Amino acid sequence: MDTVGLFSAEVEHLFIEWIKKHIKKGDLTLFERFFKADPWIVNRCDRSKITVFMWICIYGRLDFLRFLFKQESYPGEIISHYRRDKDGNSVWHYLAEKKNHLLLEEVLEYFGKIGIKVCFRNFNGITPVMKAAMRGRTLSVLSLIKYGANPNQKDYLKGFNTWDWAVFTGHADLVKSLNKDYQKPLFMHFPLYKLDVFHRRHKKKPKIIITSCEDNVYEKLPEQNPNFLCVKKLNKYGK
């Protein structure tokens, strides 16, 4: 019985791998045929537990998404957007880190009709809005916040929130946008010296750092939010 089960699982995984190739190619006609035969194909997953719906989003297939949305009587009738992969990532994590902001907006707008939770953590405590911050996806961060993402949630490993990740990964434009567009208090959770040590160790030049005190090696940015002090490093290492 166990052997039969393993064989069935392997066949399932091979089938999903084949479907993935056709999604990547953009073969919507073939996908439509499979969907009409078995609508639940969108929730089937590969060995990494990444569902077909996730792969559609990963490959940025807006035409596939619009086809799927037309097949449901209401959002979520068939498509499960809360499924997790082997690392605990949901489809929102994958959408958040993509360059194509319109794809995220399309899915948020569709599932937002019934109310959605976009603060789901993966197994490291990383939320979709943190993923977007790590990649410097400014529009995605703001869209997720608009739909209820909490930028002050911390991850499990470093204790960083969205703001911390934006600073830590050196995305100056995102930091400036958060200063301007997000009016609630945001807080830093790691000491300044740790950030500096990290950048020195990995030979990276930080664009933005945070300090709680003014110093002659720092210059305030004009976009400063009164909730916190955003500064640009001026010494020879930070240039």
UniProtKB/Swiss-Prot annotation:
Q: From the record, which residues define motif PxIxITxC motif?
A: 206-213
Residues forming the motif Nuclear localization signal are 81-87, 203-214
Gene Ontology terms describing biological process? symbiont-mediated suppression of host NF-kappaB cascade
ANK repeats span: 48-80, 87-118, 124-153, 158-187
Name what induces it: Expressed in the early phase of the viral replicative cycle.
Q: Which UniProt keywords apply?
A: ANK repeat, Host cytoplasm, Host nucleus, Host-virus interaction, Inhibition of host NF-kappa-B by virus, Repeat, Ubl conjugation
User: Partners and quaternary state?
Assistant: Interacts with host PPIA. Interacts with host PPP3CA/Calcineurin. Interacts with host RELA/p65; interaction of the 32 kDa form with host RELA results in the formation of a stable complex with NF-kappa-B. Interacts with host PPP3R1. Interacts with host EP300; this interaction inhibits the association of host EP300 with host RELA, JUN and NFATC2.
Its biological purpose is as follows: IkB-like protein that inhibits the binding of NF-kappa-B to DNA, thereby downregulating pro-inflammatory cytokine production. Forms a heterodimer with the NF-kappa-B subunit RELA/p65 and prevents the activation of the NF-kappa-B transcription factor. Inhibits calcineurin function, which is required for the induction of nuclear factor of activated T cells (NFAT)-dependent immune response genes. Prevents the binding of substrates to calcineurin without affecting the phosphatase activity.
What is the official name of this protein in its record?
IkB-like protein
According to its UniProt entry, this protein's organism is African swine fever virus (isolate Pig/Kenya/KEN-50/1950) (ASFV)
